[in-house]
């Protein structure tokens, strides 16, 4: 979804030019071993966007050549350096593109802060000390990092890659907000269970808590062991009368959440709480839809959760995140 927003930004700046998306990583199974691709590219299936994919304008034989070269590069083992190897492969099938995304092997940059976490970084002590260091630095500075301008106007044929930064403050998503909201209109709910939940969240001061662990646990360590959820829940209690908490988890985290009430600053015996854990597989995206229908959100460092908060149309919403430059109303 963030990538599609970048497409909209490029198209806005170059309205008369042909602009395409590419979904190559979803067709390479090995990529999923490094960065989870979940159910692959789903925007056309869910939102019926009919996005212009560059694959549609390349002859099948040329596309096979392109994919063979990209797979042989094993970019996913080279700091996810797809911009370099993708543009090289496009060049070799006669499509020269200027790489404006960069060279991750040269700069050490990547699309994720950590693609492969060394064993010593997985220890509780290391992660906790690292969290304390980051929290101290965060409290010392409220500066918003400078992110690349996503509204690029050019006469060159370019490969932009993915910045995935529209979820951050100062990146300009408001410039394409009408187009984004028009694109991401969820289909009507179909299951009786989802419909029942939608009715519940509309009739109370509903608070969605996105307790995503799974593949994002190393990035959200501080949320669970640094008191983030407790601070966010405490603030919600101060500002919202009779809140009801709806906890959304990935399938493998539900039981963990049910046995760790203290992590969330909740009392499962006395607080009004409901777990949402039935949307799985091809229906996983329904959780985003249901979370967006809640009055308020408490999210982690996850674009899935962030979209639920951003798409929430409640004018008095409170949206909480653990990073001071996330585009939410509050940070803890």
Residue ranges and their predicted role:
Residues 1, 240-327:
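Donor-binding and catalytic core of enzymes assembling or modifying cell-surface/extracellular glycoconjugates
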Residues 1-30:
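N-terminal pre-catalytic "stem/leader" segment of glycosyltransferase-like enzymes
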Residues 4, 8, 195, 309-310:
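Residues within alpha-helical segments
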Residues 6, 229-232, 260:
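A general structural detector for well-ordered alpha-helical segments in enzyme core domains, enriched
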Residues 9-18, 46-54, 233-243, 264-274, ...:
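Structural alpha-beta junctions
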Residues 25-29, 164-166, 171, 212-216, ...:
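Short, solvent-exposed loop/turn segments at secondary-structure junctions
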Residues 31-49, 253-267, 332:
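Short, aromatic/basic amphipathic alpha-helical patches
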Residues 33-240:
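Secretory-pathway luminal glycosyltransferase catalytic domains
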